[in-house]
Amino acid sequence: MPENFGYISQVIGSVVDVSYRYTSGGLPKINDALQITHSNGKVLIVEVQQHIGEDTVRAVAMDSTDGISRGMKAVNLGRPISMPIGNQVKGRLLNVIGETIDGMKCLSYENTKSIHCDPPKFKDLSTSVEVLFTGIKVIDLLAPYLKGGKIGLFGGAGVGKTVLIMELINNIAKKHNGFSVFAGVGERTREGNDLLREMIESGVIRYGKEFEEGMRLGEWDLSKIDYEELKKSQATLVFGQMNEPPGARSSVVLSGLTIAEAFRDQSGSDGHDVLFFIDNIFRFTQAGSEVSALLGRMPSAVGYQPTLATEMGKMQERITSTKNGSITSIQAVYVPADDLTDPAPATTFTFLDATTVLDRKIFELGIYPAVDPLNSVSRILDPNVLGQEHYDTAQKVKQLLQRYKELQDIIAILGMEELSEEDKLVVNRARRVQRFLSQPFFMAEAFSGIPGVMVSREDTIKGFNMLMNGDVDYLPEQAFLNVGTIEDAIEKGKKLTALT
């Protein structure tokens, strides 16, 4: 097959125009990948986004355009960007175009899958409703996650979204033996490094004993990696970090999703229930808005791209459960200036089955995870799915916390003394409930000094029922902070009482 190529006619930032005026081949299709080779042999992949006139295409670069000039040859690969799939990607770190970035041996690209593909057909979708319990009290009780659903973690800067995502990866890998794909979208490179180290330490990614012993001594010797052990890893990481151009940041979600789909759709009994983590979905939107103006689109509200809902919908529609397996998506959503009405988080809301909202005021109280129990919702908080006892307990907790919220204005103006005895009891009990919604995390052990815990649904319901019934009103408030079960709170209460 003859090589189909054009010549670069214009470069503006990360957008490249390629002219086919003087070549015999036809124009590449939308989403086709073009390959540009520098004089030093370095390869740049660009993705076709628009046809301009009869003989020019406009493409978005997946890496820096430094060193690119007019007149350079751009070869049409005749296919979209494709990701390597199969067991070979377990435990590996990849970039947006499927290249390894972990310094280990290269992958085979014989078995690949396009990052642009259609969602599953309607007849292949699964309709079963199953709960994914996380071992985190506040989530399992008040906003439980649907297996195969889409979950959003909403919060401003620095309230704990990434720590919560890392805890969920750890808990679900341990509890459900699930496979995880993590897409790092426009976040700090340091966080990606921390995540990899945490995953190696917790056994989610397996580099082998010899490497792990060296890592504990401060070494990072890739020659010590056991590749047989690596194949037993339970996660793949795909990164398009904040120092990369917007093309990479907007497409890396699709790259990660493609790998997750491949694991879900494996034939026979190998079909997986996959967890797909995105940190941060806002950066996907932000990258799209950066590229949008360069592509000549008129910006819409607050400067976002006019195609925001379309781009989000295309991606979210692919995250679904089939009869062969499921993809449960957990998406961190940065909320600009803590404003949930901003178009980016507001558009994301419409696709989700459950939302976990992290609140700065709760964070400032020292309650971690800083989940807002009144704003966090789930469509499966239903007695037909969870059972009557779970549903009743959750509703009682929410009613108590709502009443406490209403009383806070009165307390701020008049003080506790002006409340009725009944309202004083509500306040004292609600403060205990609020603190009992906190929990020590495995991923925070290093800086909190408190061992992490997973709490079963039964223990969670039992603990909150005892709180609501007043069985533990005699314990000091501090006894309920950063404990797992109600038994842990009683034990801590005894120690605190003994100290006083």
UniProtKB/Swiss-Prot annotation:
GO cellular component assignments: plasma membrane; proton-transporting ATP synthase complex
Protein's cellular compartments: Cell inner membrane
Keyword annotations of the record: ATP synthesis, ATP-binding, Cell inner membrane, Cell membrane, CF(1), Hydrogen ion transport, Ion transport, Membrane, Nucleotide-binding, Translocase, Transport
Residues that coordinate or bind ATP: 155-162
Transmembrane segments: none
Catalytic activity: ATP + H2O + 4 H(+)(in) = ADP + phosphate + 5 H(+)(out)
Keyword Cell membrane: yes
Gene3D superfamilies hit by this protein: 2.40.10.170, Bovine Mitochondrial F1-atpase, Atp Synthase Beta Chain, Chain D, domain 3, P-loop containing nucleotide triphosphate hydrolases
Pfam family, one: ATP-synt_ab
Enzyme class: translocase
Record-linked SUPFAM superfamilies: C-terminal domain of alpha and beta subunits of F1 ATP synthase, N-terminal domain of alpha and beta subunits of F1 ATP synthase, P-loop containing nucleoside triphosphate hydrolases
Protein's UniProt keywords contain GTP-binding: no
GO molecular function: ATP binding; ATP hydrolysis activity; proton-transporting ATP synthase activity, rotational mechanism
Domain of life: Bacteria
Enzyme Commission code: 7.1.2.2
Topology in the lipid bilayer: Peripheral membrane protein
Physiological role: Produces ATP from ADP in the presence of a proton gradient across the membrane. The catalytic sites are hosted primarily by the beta subunits.
Quaternary organization: F-type ATPases have 2 components, CF(1) - the catalytic core - and CF(0) - the membrane proton channel. CF(1) has five subunits: alpha(3), beta(3), gamma(1), delta(1), epsilon(1). CF(0) has three main subunits: a(1), b(2) and c(9-12). The alpha and beta chains form an alternating ring which encloses part of the gamma chain. CF(1) is attached to CF(0) by a central stalk formed by the gamma and epsilon chains, while a peripheral stalk is formed by the delta and b chains.
Family, as annotated: Belongs to the ATPase alpha/beta chains family.
Stated name of the protein: ATP synthase subunit beta
Lineage: Bacteria, Pseudomonadati, Bacteroidota, Bacteroidia, Bacteroidales
Encoding gene per record: atpD
